Amino acid sequence: MSDDKPFLCTAPGCGQRFTNEDHLAVHKHKHEMTLKFGPARNDSVIVADQTPTPTRFLKNCEEVGLFNELASPFENEFKKASEDDIKKMPLDLSPLATPIIRSKIEEPSVVETTHQDSPLPHPESTTNDEKEIPLAQTAQPTSAIVRPASLQVPNVLLTSSDSSVIIQQAVPSPTSSTVITQAPSSNRPIVPVPGPFPLLLHLPNGQTMPVAIPASITSSNVHVPAAVPLVRPVTMVPSVPGIPGPSSPQPVQSEAKMRLKAALTQQHPPVTNGDTVKGHGSGLVRAQSEESRPQSLQQPATSTTETPASPAHTTPQTQNTSGRRRRAANEDPDEKRRKFLERNRAAASRCRQKRKVWVQSLEKKAEDLSSLNGQLQSEVTLLRNEVAQLKQLLLAHKDCPVTAMQKKSGYHTADKDDSSEDLSVPSSPHTEAIQHSSVSTSNGVSSTSKTEAGATSVLTQMADQSTEPALSQIVMAPSSQAQPSGS
């Protein structure tokens, strides 16, 4: 055995023998490969388990927290302010309370004024109905107030270099709204605002949209009254059936988000080419003076109240087009398919009607042409029969003495034809027909169409009535009359 396989493998634990050195080298190479890549093969199984599949990727994202919504920096402040308003304002939670949106402004609410250098104040309570805050007699370039009933944007931040107006609608609190105005310091000069106001629109999903409102006020002689009239807060209770009252703030917040989305999709963006933020129908920024207030602001005609007037005409057109698109998008696919099939059926019926009319016209034309063709064929048949009869008569009178005499005389002129006609008329009309037929066949001279028609009719009658004795009489009669004409 050892003599047959002298080459022994030197690997530990392997006592195989081979007949030649080549087999041993191949075997050793296998040992080397196993020793070198054995652990790597075991690790490859673990790597395969760590393949980043979509499920594992989503799981890792959830563990890291990428799918969590980012907390808004303003959300805590707004939540605190709304909770304070809910605590301080008594709510009527009786079973007979129904959701009501008051469209009429009855009593004033609180307007807070602070120095421009002071930090942004938190919203205060709006339950003091008779409270008035005196303001310093300072010139203010812009003074605007927003009706909360028509404002559909929950968080709006309006800032400028000289004054800032913060408009806030507390979304969790459906019965409170606060208007805060900051007046500039009295020792600063009033400078007209050259550029537009930067407006920061804060959306409920945590995003901010920068927009701009043009400052069209150029004169600075704006008088601020001694006491700013206060406006009673308008309750923003959503009129949703099945919800008795504003006890749960979460549905109110979702309702506000839905209304904001509807407003953004229904209208064009809130500020385009100098338009101010609009609500559903009457959400326009008004001047601080109202007709029912004794004190008013004296502003020029280029106030911010008149800037939305010109784009108001284009709003219905955009609303109409967006309404059509929205109706088209909201249609049921089954309804779309039904309308599509109905239009197809109507088009197919119209096409079939047109094709039917066209086929009927073609059939009528074919019938007319076939009738005309039948008439022409019958006429051709009659003419052929007549030609055959004339040929038979011609062959019958080929050896007639009148024909031979006419060949001798010649009938060189048409006058001689007429004279022969006059001479032959008293004897018999048959002679006239025979003379004309013989002249036309022997000499090839064409006569008038009238004489041809007469000859044709006479020959037809002769074909019916011709007998041998009659032909002899007809031949003998002109023989005596033809001699004077020849002489």
Swiss-Prot record:
Subcellular location: Nucleus; Cytoplasm; Mitochondrion outer membrane
GO molecular function: cAMP response element binding; cAMP response element binding protein binding; chromatin binding; cis-regulatory region sequence-specific DNA binding; DNA binding; DNA-binding transcription activator activity, RNA polymerase II-specific; DNA-binding transcription factor activity; DNA-binding transcription factor activity, RNA polymerase II-specific
Compositionally biased residues, Low complexity: 300-316, 437-449
An annotated GO BP: positive regulation of transcription by RNA polymerase II
A Pfam family annotated for this UniProt entry: bZIP_1
Keywords: Acetylation, Activator, Cytoplasm, DNA damage, DNA-binding, Membrane, Metal-binding, Mitochondrion, Mitochondrion outer membrane, Nucleus, Phosphoprotein, Transcription, Transcription regulation, Zinc, Zinc-finger
Chain positions of motif Nuclear export signal: 387-396
Phosphoserine: residues carrying this PTM: S44, S72, S94, S103, S118, S310, S322, S349, S424, S428, S472, S480
Region (Disordered): 107-130, 241-355, 407-487
Stretches for region Basic motif: 336-356
PTM sites of type Phosphothreonine: T34, T51, T53, T55, T98
Domain bZIP: 334-397
Keyword Transmembrane on entry: no
Positions where N6-acetyllysine occurs in the chain: K339, K356
Zinc finger (C2H2-type): 7-31
Regions of compositional bias (Polar residues) in chain numbering: 264-275, 425-436, 457-470, 478-487
Cysteines joined through disulfide linkages: none
PTM entry text: Phosphorylation of Thr-51 by MAPK14 and MAPK11, and at Thr-53 by MAPK1/ERK2, MAPK3/ERK1, MAPK11, MAPK12 and MAPK14 in response to external stimulus like insulin causes increased transcriptional activity. Phosphorylated by PLK3 following hyperosmotic stress. Also phosphorylated and activated by JNK and CaMK4. ATM-mediated phosphorylation at Ser-472 and Ser-480 stimulates its function in DNA damage response. Phosphorylation at Ser-44, Thr-55 and Ser-103 activates its transcriptional activity. Phosphorylation at Thr-51 or Thr-53 enhances acetylation of histones H2B and H4.
Residue ranges, annotated region (Essential for its histone acetyltransferase activity): 278-281
Subunit and interaction comment: Binds DNA as a dimer and can form a homodimer in the absence of DNA. Can form a heterodimer with JUN. Heterodimerization is essential for its transcriptional activity. Interacts with SMAD3 and SMAD4. Binds through its N-terminal region to UTF1 which acts as a coactivator of ATF2 transcriptional activity. Interacts with the HK1/VDAC1 complex. Interacts with NBN, MRE11, XPO1, KAT5 and CUL3.
Function: Transcriptional activator which regulates the transcription of various genes, including those involved in anti-apoptosis, cell growth, and DNA damage response. Dependent on its binding partner, binds to CRE (cAMP response element) consensus sequences (5'-TGACGTCA-3') or to AP-1 (activator protein 1) consensus sequences (5'-TGACTCA-3'). In the nucleus, contributes to global transcription and the DNA damage response, in addition to specific transcriptional activities that are related to cell development, proliferation and death.
Family, as annotated: Belongs to the bZIP family. ATF subfamily.
Listed name of the protein: Cyclic AMP-dependent transcription factor ATF-2
Organism of this sequence: Rattus norvegicus (Rat)
Classification lineage: Eukaryota, Metazoa, Chordata, Craniata, Vertebrata
The encoding gene: Atf2
